[in-house]
Each structure stands twice: as structure tokens, then as C-alpha cells.
Amino acid sequence: MAAAPRAGRRRGQPLLALLLLLLAPLPPGAPPGADAYFPEERWSPESPLQAPRVLIALLARNAAHALPTTLGALERLRHPRERTALWVATDHNMDNTSTVLREWLVAVKSLYHSVEWRPAEEPRSYPDEEGPKHWSDSRYEHVMKLRQAALKSARDMWADYILFVDADNLILNPDTLSLLIAENKTVVAPMLDSRAAYSNFWCGMTSQGYYKRTPAYIPIRKRDRRGCFAVPMVHSTFLIDLRKAASRNLAFYPPHPDYTWSFDDIIVFAFSCKQAEVQMYVCNKEEYGFLPVPLRAHSTLQDEAESFMHVQLEVMVKHPPAEPSRFISAPTKTPDKMGFDEVFMINLRRRQDRRERMLRALQAQEIECRLVEAVDGKAMNTSQVEALGIQMLPGYRDPYHGRPLTKGELGCFLSHYNIWKEVVDRGLQKSLVFEDDLRFEIFFKRRLMNLMRDVEREGLDWDLIYVGRKRMQVEHPEKAVPRVRNLVEADYSYWTLAYVISLQGARKLLAAEPLSKMLPVDEFLPVMFDKHPVSEYKAHFSLRNLHAFSVEPLLIYPTHYTGDDGYVSDTETSVVWNNEHVKTDWDRAKSQKMREQQALSREAKNSDVLQSPLDSAARDEL
């Protein structure tokens, strides 16, 4: 009889375990309804909302040069393509814009929700325009009508948003669309960068609707202030939230009945926003992309293509290159040497990133170069230095830190020295030398070729022409060269970023036997054209007759200056030339040599130099 209670307890244990299991809390992440005992009580969770419907509107005219890269950037936007519609219009083309767009649309049509294609092959120009870059009234009106048609299409298809993108605007941040949507603004633009102060927004507007300079602009443009800012104007690339009730009152055409300002598409739309009480915003929280500085009305299609190519070069200075669309055939490039006998590009083997960027930059400009492996001074030991017969110039000290020559500076000198030897050995009449840490100015190739033609036409006796440098004599202007545009007689200068050297000039530099009395190469050159301020250095070189000139304005600048993110020096952050134990890394943060060119007084500016038409091809920065 005593065993019966124990058997009952054993029978009750499974029931107790089942009850505890039913009452136990659900594990983290279990779906709602999973705790239901009966099947009919179980239910599935609600699915997330679908991505918003977006229409991307692209208007293109004479944009064949830009479209492969612009469209490649649009392809990489992180937004579901099945929730994205394309609205594309092109007309009045003098190039093959229609062909490029058609090739792309045929390839991507099945990837997107829908495609609306509005091509017009004729006419090729407007009757009242002076050239392809001139904005006449009829062109403004036509563009306004096209934007209005795109807006109507977006409304008709019940799109949540419409994103307007100019054909030469590069949206490189793939999250741009989602970031703008998250701002929850009726009209919002991503701030696009350019080579100058220009961007796709205004901070001020006059009572007549024109641009007004304000103190607020530059801090936003430079991202000293970050955020989303209320502004009177955004243009080129911007997003409209069509879910907002006020968006129904926005229009590009016809202009508002009360509109009396200039007949300009961006001003007309800004006025429409103002009348609808819709505030425009520009966001600079992230880096979103780039756009070119507008060209003047007299500019050509070649100017425009080279201007956009320069945007791509600027992208590569601090970002990965902007890759073109894989759906568009790449045009064939035919690099040349720009009329030089040789184009040298110096690069340290361990600086692969610089090499790749420079080779891509030169290829983009169709410049053929010979890659020269730089002498790595840091890898040289004292025995190797002595075997070359190298001795430092007696008494030399760095002008900023009082240190002797570094191994990095030694390697830099030998790299240039070896090129001078090759110039002489091969009998090269004129050569162009690049270092690998430089950025190109707009129209670089054409401007330098024009300069060299002027030099040859005038029969100028020259040995070396700086293409990029840091001007050290800033007290008075340099002497302009008569009848040669963009050229001055060089005074004391730093840097050997890029220069042109003649056979005669290379012979003069080698004849000075500089290895036996070495100093940094950018100190040696001013000694040789007798402009160095330290007479003790010059005394060691009896023949100082190098004929040196400089391009003005410069066509080459450094990619980075002291203090910039990414600044690296292979010459100043090194060790002393004859002692591996004496380091000079203190210069990394304090280097004065690689600081940006100091501002010149009005009296010291080279204002007498003859200017080229290409110097003023771009409009005012703002």
C-alpha cells in the first residue's frame, strides 16, 4: 500500500513538466504566436513595409562624355531596382548622347520597375543660343517643361519620391537616396563637392532672385558645420517627397503667376517652393558626390568633356575612382606624349596606391608615360651611399628644423638625377617629369601643350620649366616672359612635383657634379639658376646658368599638405643620410616645407603674365 503514492507522483511528473513548459517564457527572437497551444491560435508576424517607390529623372544634353560614369553611379544606389522607375530625356545633341542612353536603357530596362524614354534627335541646337554651353531663354523654357513632365509622370504613377539628377553629377555614396529619404523633408539635396567653392545650393538670394554671398555658405561648403540646413536654393541633384501635401503645389512650368524674376529654371522652381511655403534643405552630413564647376557660355564641348574628366581626377585624390557603367561600351583612348620626347613618372615601389592613382589619372587624360622606379633612400645603407661617392653639401641644414639631409631626400635626389642621366644618354630634347603625389589643374594637357607651342614659336632659350612648385620668394612679382602666355622667370622655389627639362638643362645639372655636394633636389635647382638666398650654398657651384621658368598659374599642385588627412612624406619623415639611428619623424606634424603656398600680397602677384583663354573658361566659383 505504501508504493501507491509514489506511483501517483511518477504519473504526475510528465503533466507537471508539460505545464511548466507551457508557462515558461519564450526564448528571445521567437515569433509572436509561437506560444499558442492550439494550431488555430498561432499567427505569423506582420511583414516590413516595402521600400518607397522612387522615380529617377535624368535630363541629358551633349553628355556622352559623362554618362558612362554618371549612370554607373546611379546603378550602385542601394535602393531596390524593382521599386525604382527611370525617366530619361535627351535632345538638341551634337554628340552621341542618345546612342549612349539607348544602349544603357536597353540593357537595364528589365532590372527597373519601368522606363520612360524621351529622345529627340532634331533639332541639334536652339535658334537663340550662341553655343552648346549658352543658356538661352528657349533652352531654359524647354528644360522647365521637361522637369515638369517628369514630375507629372512621378505623380501619375503614385511615386513616393522623385530624384532629379543632372547628367554630369556623380552620386558616389550608394546610400545617398536612403539618407535623403530619412531626412523627411519635402525638398532636400545632398551637398555635392567640386574643385572650387561651387556646389548645388545657395545660402542667400537677393530680392530679385539672384545669388547673394553670405557668411553661412563657406562653413557649410567646407563641412565646418554639418547637418541639414534650410537654404533658399538647391539645384542639379535633389529629392522631392511627393507624399507631402505641400508637394502638390510645386511646379517647374509654367512659372508662378506672380513670378517676375530672371527666366532661369532653378530660380523659377525656388520661387515655386517659396510660394508653396516649402522650405528647401541641403545636407552635408556625409560625402555624397561631385559635380563640375559650370563653364562660361563661350565654352566648347571639348571644354565640357575635359571639365568632367577633371571631376573624375579630383575624385581619385581622396576616394576610389568613379567606375563607369558595365552596360555601356567604353570609348577607345589613344594616349600620347604631348609632344615631349618622353614623359617620366617617378614612383616608389612600396607606394602602390599612388602608382595606381597616377596611372589612372594619366590614362584618363590620354597621357603616355614611362614609369620610373624611385630610389628608396630609406632602404639604402651607409655603404651603398659611400659607394656612389655621395657627400652632403658642407654646412647644409634644413631651413626649418636645422637637420641635415635625410635618406628620403637622398633617394628623391637620386631619382631625379637618374632621369637627367637618361635624358642625356638618350639625347631627349625635351621631357616632362612627374612625381606621384600631385593633382592636376583643369585643362592640364591642353594648357601645357599650348604653352610649349608658344615657347617654341618664340625661340625661348630654356632649360627647365616648373609646372608645379611652391613659390618661396613672395616679396615682389616674378618677371613675365614677353609674348609667351602663362610663363614667368622662376625665382626661389620649392618642390619638384612636375617640370619640363631640356637636354641642355639636364647636361648643366649633371655637369655640376651634385652627388659630391648634395642637398635636397628642390634646393639644388634654385642654386643652379642662381636664385637661392643662401650664398654659402651657391659658392660650391661655380657655374649657375640654368635658365629656369615657371608656368603661371600653376598646372600642378600637391594632393596633400602638412596636416591634411592622408599626408605622408617619404623625404622628411626618414633618417639622417649617414646615420640610420637619427630619425627625423618630428617633421610629420610640423613640416613647413609641405605647407600650402602662403598668400601673396597684391604687389607680389604675377599680374603682368599674359593669360590664356583657358584660364578663364570656368564661371565664378559661386
Curated annotation (Swiss-Prot):
UniProt-annotated stretches for the region Disordered: 588-622
Top-rank taxon: Eukaryota
Classification via Pfam families: Glyco_tranf_2_4, Glyco_transf_25
Annotated consequence of substituting residue 166 to A: Loss of galactosyltransferase activity
Enzyme class, first EC level, given as a word: transferase
Tissue expr: Ubiquitous with higher levels in placenta, heart, lung and spleen.
Keyword Mitochondrion: no
Short sequence motif Endoplasmic reticulum retention motif: positions: 619-622
Compartments, as annotated in UniProt: Endoplasmic reticulum lumen
Catalytic activity: (5R)-5-hydroxy-L-lysyl-[collagen] + UDP-alpha-D-galactose = (5R)-5-O-(beta-D-galactosyl)-5-hydroxy-L-lysyl-[collagen] + UDP + H(+)
Result of changing residue 168 to A: Loss of galactosyltransferase activity
E.C. number(s) listed in UniProt: 2.4.1.50
Gene Ontology CC annotations of this record: endoplasmic reticulum lumen; membrane
GO molecular function terms noted in the UniProt entry: procollagen galactosyltransferase activity
Post-translational modification: N-glycosylated.
PANTHER family hit by this protein: PROCOLLAGEN GALACTOSYLTRANSFERASE 1, PROCOLLAGEN-LYSINE,2-OXOGLUTARATE 5-DIOXYGENASE/GLYCOSYLTRANSFERASE 25 FAMILY MEMBER
Name the record gives this protein: Procollagen galactosyltransferase 1
Species annotation: Homo sapiens
Name of the gene encoding the protein in the UniProt record: COLGALT1
